[in-house]
Amino acid sequence: MTLLNVCGLSHHYAHGGFSGKHQHQAVLNNVSLTLKSGETVALLGRSGCGKSTLARLLVGLESPSQGNISWRGESLAKLNRAQRKAFRRDIQMVFQDSISAVNPRKTVREILREPMRHLLSLKKSEQLARASEMLKAVDLDDSVLDKRPPQLSGGQLQLVCLARALAVEPKLLILDEAVSNLDLVLQAGVIRLLKKLQQQFGTACLFITHDLRLVERFCQRVMVMDNGQIAETQAVGDKLTFSSDAGRVLQNAVLPAFPVRRRTSEKV
């Protein structure tokens, strides 16, 4: 089943110039893509290529300058109030900058309950039980419930944001560089959790990343983005080989797991 369909999406930002006239900076140009239920897709690209802007459009934080985004066959621009509430539950996003994505004055308990209060019909006791359950799912315990964001490490706060997104049982989870910055142990745990959710609920995942190793370990399909456009799309096999210049640049930038010793035929 197709969850998300993007057709001919373009976007620009207007800013004032020295002449006082508004100038338009193009960020996305004619982007089209689809995401299906249970699918894991990577959006791969260098910083500044338009990945995060596309993500903000997909979750409805901004409206595109041109083109259409459809969720389960319905255009986002035409959703009524009830449909928009359902959409906000169905699609959740975890941002790279976790400290900016939460209220620093709120406790972890309040942060986790927030989407449940607005998007689900659960009693307070049920919300608290699910908050505890979600923390356990991301390898955190109840000891963090009364802490505030400044009291947590960056990795812990990122996991709290992931738990918050998962608390409403979304059909699509968008992770904007949200896993790449975790250490390898935490990253492996998150990947195991997401695979479990896919098997149980058919949750789809869109990884926005520049981490090619993450793509190879977890994703079924990869789209390479460059200068606001999709440069290529391909299935992820045993070994990725890109045809686009942008893809090859990212592939060549990956360091080997261990340093390669150079062999010399002569002793110095």
From Swiss-Prot:
Q: Name one Pfam family in it.
A: ABC_tran
Q: Which reaction does it catalyse?
A: Ni(2+)(out) + ATP + H2O = Ni(2+)(in) + ADP + phosphate + H(+)
Q: What are the entry keywords?
A: ATP-binding, Cell inner membrane, Cell membrane, Ion transport, Membrane, Nickel, Nickel transport, Nucleotide-binding, Translocase, Transport
Q: Which domain of life is it from?
A: Bacteria
- Give the ABC transporter domain ranges: 4-252
* UniProt main location, coarse: membrane
Q: What are the protein's GO molecular function terms? A: ABC-type nickel transporter activity; ATP binding; ATP hydrolysis activity; nickel cation binding
Q: Phosphoprotein among the record's keywords?
A: no
Q: What class of enzyme is it?
A: translocase
What are the subcellular locations of this protein? Answer: Cell inner membrane
Give EC number(s), comma-separated: 7.2.2.11
What are the binding positions for ATP in this chain?
G45, R46, S47, G48, C49, G50, K51, S52
- Cite a GO CC annotation: plasma membrane
Q: How does it sit in the membrane?
A: Peripheral membrane protein
User: What role does this protein play?
Assistant: Part of the ABC transporter complex NikABCDE involved in nickel import. Responsible for energy coupling to the transport system.
Q: How does it assemble?
A: The complex is composed of two ATP-binding proteins (NikD and NikE), two transmembrane proteins (NikB and NikC) and a solute-binding protein (NikA).
Q: Of which family is this protein a member?
A: Belongs to the ABC transporter superfamily. Nickel importer (TC 3.A.1.5.3) family.
UniProt-recorded name of the protein: Nickel import ATP-binding protein NikE
Gene (name only):
nikE
